[in-house]
Swiss-Prot record:
This is Proton extrusion protein PxcA. Residues 146-167, 186-205 are annotated as: Disordered. Disulfide bonds: none annotated. GO terms for molecular function: proton transmembrane transporter activity. Required for H(+) efflux immediately after light irradiation to form a rapid H(+) concentration gradient across the thylakoid membranes. Together with PxcL, contributes to transient H(+) uptake following dark to light transition.
Length: 467
């Protein structure tokens, strides 16, 4: 009998284990090869359709549908290359001398270090072009490094004429920004900030012509510039992409945790819980509040039966009949609160899955978070001072205002019922006495530190409205 078992193991199970071990040992080579293939695919798109240059989404050679097709392929290949490079690094980190010896015994030959280095170098050369792709989704096309260098390198022969030209460049970019308010990568933000500082310094000085005439000249030059329309179109496309990415990410961070909670509760937590629970020894009430609610409901039911028995024209019920109805109601309440207790326990584990899904979504969506931040910056800073002050007052009054303790109390009691915990009044009152105060301090510090520097007029409007 043992010999038969050994023969079955050697004939069926051992080859499966050996092939799985070979697959594990080949993980570094396989990951690097897949990343290399993804880089080759990107390079092929560049060579065939962009003359060997970087894939430019603002190119006017192809239509929007074609560029969307290239963008989808590029995103997929970049994702594959980066994931496989990460897998390669981790598998190399776990690889040691014993694994290499086992690979040689299994007949596995790793590629030479020169081949590996050449592939890694090629992958880095291809991927490095798209490191700031997420910035470029929201980057304006109206400002380029060459324009900044040309503007800063020209000597100011005529102060007024120089002011007019610089004012024209700034107004051209500001016109597009006022229409679609695109954002910029850090390098362009720094360059444009330095350029605007120089322009403001020149504008503050007294020139031959008034500044209003210079701004009029700049506006006319913008209207007559043949590239102005293309700049507006490009910035509209970038703003549209930014809005789509931001709204999609907002929907994801709302829908994914809720969907994870419902699916994990129905498909994972409930079957496991129902398998291990014992209906005979299962606790009916998780806390004293549930018990008090059940007893109060049963007492009201008993009083209602007696009251209806006294005022009805039908023959009075006997004590046994009343006791039977009360017993049926008690069993109904026991089943109801047993289900509520089980549901509360399931909610705890389902919420853990939801939090895990939320954290995972944040970790894998860092580019989307950056785009979302830029989107909110443009929306908030595009509001008027009165609107900013109104929103600040609304949020502060809701969360830290005079009536906010009632809202916090409802939220905490709802969370307690959701998890089957008793509503601890001492903890609730302590939370209400401390957390809104901390939140109010953070609000005031943010207003004093950041908003006062970014928009002093909004702070002044906020103070006037608050008074």
């Amino acid at each position: 009998m043992p010999t038969m078992r050994n023969s079955i193991f050697s004939e069926k199970i051992y080859p499966i284990l050996l092939s799985a071990y070979r697959w594990y040992l080949r993980t570094p080579e396989r990951s690097l090869e897949e990343a290399y293939k993804a880089a080759l695919n990107i390079k092929a798109i560049e060579d065939e359709h962009f003359n060997g240059n970087k894939i430019d989404f603002n190119s006017a050679i192809y239509s929007n549908s074609v560029m969307d097709y290239f963008e989808s392929d590029l995103a997929q290949e970049l994702k594959t290359a980066r994931m496989r490079l990460t897998e390669f690094r981790f598998s190399r980190w776990f690889s040691n001398e014993s694994h290499q010896k086992a690979a040689r015994k299994a007949g596995i030959e790793y590629p030479s270090s020169n081949v590996t280095l050449e592939k890694l170098k090629f992958i880095d050369e291809v991927i490095s072009k798209y490191i700031i792709t997420d910035y470029e989704i929201v980057a304006p096309s109206g400002v380029s490094e060459s324009q900044v260098r040309t503007t800063s390198s020209q000597p100011p022969e005529n102060p007024s004429l120089t002011d007019a030209l610089r004012t024209n460049d700034i107004n051209k970019n500001n016109l597009v920004e006022r229409i679609y308010t695109p954002t910029s990568p850090p390098q362009l933000i720094k360059q444009r900030t330095e350029q605007s500082k120089k322009s403001r310094g020149k504008a503050d000085t007294t020139g031959i012509l008034p500044r209003s005439i210079l701004s009029t000249i700049g506006r006319l030059q913008i209207e007559l510039d043949p590239n102005a329309e293309q700049d507006v179109i490009n910035n509209f496309r970038q703003a549209q992409k930014r809005s789509i990415i931001s709204i999609r990410f907002i929907l994801l961070i709302i829908i994914v945790p809720l969907l994870t909670h419902q699916l994990s509760k129905a498909l994972i937590v409930s079957p496991i819980f129902n398998h291990f629970k014992n209906d005979h020894t299962e606790q009916i009430f998780l806390n004293s509040e549930m018990e008090e609610e059940a007893l109060s409901t049963l007492h009201r039911f008993e009083e209602r039966i007696k009251f209806e028995n006294l005022i009805s024209n039908a023959p009075p019920l006997s004590a046994e009949a009343i006791e039977t109805q009360i017993k049926e109601k008690a069993e109904e309440l026991a089943a109801e609160f047993r289900g509520e207790s089980s549901n509360a326990i399931k909610n705890v584990f389902a919420d853990i899955f939801s939090v895990g899904a939320f954290i995972w979504l944040l970790l894998v969506s860092k580019p989307s978070i950056m785009v979302l931040k830029e989107f909110f910056d443009n929306v908030v800073y595009g509001l008027s001072d009165s609107a900013k002050a109104f929103i600040i007052i609304l949020f502060t009054d809701v969360f830290v205002g005079f009536h906010s303790p009632h809202g916090w109390e409802v939220i905490l009691e709802g969370l307690s019922r959701h998890w089957g915990l008793p509503a601890n009044r001492d903890f609730i009152f302590l939370f209400i006495a401390t957390f809104p105060v901390i939140l109010d301090t953070i609000f005031k510090y943010w207003i004093f530190r950041y908003l006062n520097r970014i928009s002093p007029s909004a702070v002044a409007t906020y103070r006037n409205m608050n008074e």
